[in-house]
Amino acid sequence: MGYRNGNYAAFYVSEPFSESSLGANATKDFVSYNMLRAWKGKDNNYPFNDSHDKTYNVRDGSDWEKTLKPRLRKRLDQSKNIIFFLSKHTENSKALREEIDYGINVKGLPVIVVYPELSEKSDIIDCTTKVFRSEVVNLWSRVPVFKDSMLKVPTIHIPYKKDQIKKALENKDFMINSKISAGSVYFYPC
C-alpha cells in the first residue's frame, strides 16, 4: 500500500458522469472540488494532495464492482482524511455512499466537511449557543451513511473559504496517523 498522505475529496456528481459539455460542472459540489484543485495549481504550497491523482481516471461506463469501486477504495486506502463537499445539491449516489461508508467505517478516516453554500462559521453554528444550525443538520440527511457514521471519526465542519479549508487540511487532529478522539463534532470558533 502507498503512503497515506492524500486528501480524498468526496463530492456528488450526477450519474452517469460526463466531463463533456457542462457534464460534471453542472454539479455544484464538483465545481467546489475543482476550485480546491485550482488553489493548489496556483500555489504549490497549498496543503491539498489530491488522492484522485493517485490512480488513473475511470469513466462511468466502467464496471462498478470490477473497476470503479476498487479504484475508489484504493484512493481511500492512500488517504489521510476525507474532504466532503456537502450542499443542498448533494445526492445520495452509489459512489458517494461507498466513499463515505468505506472511508469512515472501514478506514477510520477523519472528515473535513466543507459547505460550498456557506461562507461564514456563523452560517454553520449559532456562535452564542455553539449549536449547529438546523439547515446544516438537515444537510447531513442527504447522505444517511454520513449522518449515521460521522461520530465514529473526528469530523470538522467548515464554511467554503480558502483559508478555513487550508487550516483544516493542515490540522493534524484531522489526519489518520495523528487524529483526535472520535465521538464529537468540531468547528472553529466564531
From Swiss-Prot:
GO terms for biological process: defense response to virus. Its main location: cytoplasm. InterPro entries: ThsB__TIR-like_domain. It is an enzyme of class 3 (hydrolase). Disruption phenotype: When this gene is missing the Thoeris system does not confer phage resistance in B.subtilis. The keyword Hydrolase applies. Its EC number is 3.2.2.-. Keywords: Antiviral defense, Cytoplasm, Hydrolase, NAD. Signal peptide: none annotated. It is found in: Cytoplasm. One of its GO terms (cellular component) is cytoplasm. Transmembrane segments: none annotated. Activated upon phage infection. It comes from the Bacteria. One of its GO terms (molecular function) is hydrolase activity. It holds the Pfam family ThsB_TIR. TIR-like domain-containing component of the Thoeris antiviral defense system, composed of ThsA and ThsB. Expression of ThsA and ThsB in B.subtilis (strain BEST7003) confers resistance to phages SBSphiC, SBSphiJ and SPO1. Phage infection activates this protein, generating a signal molecule that in turn activates ThsA. Belongs to the Thoeris B TIR-like family. Homodimer. This is Putative cyclic ADP-D-ribose synthase ThsB. The gene is thsB.
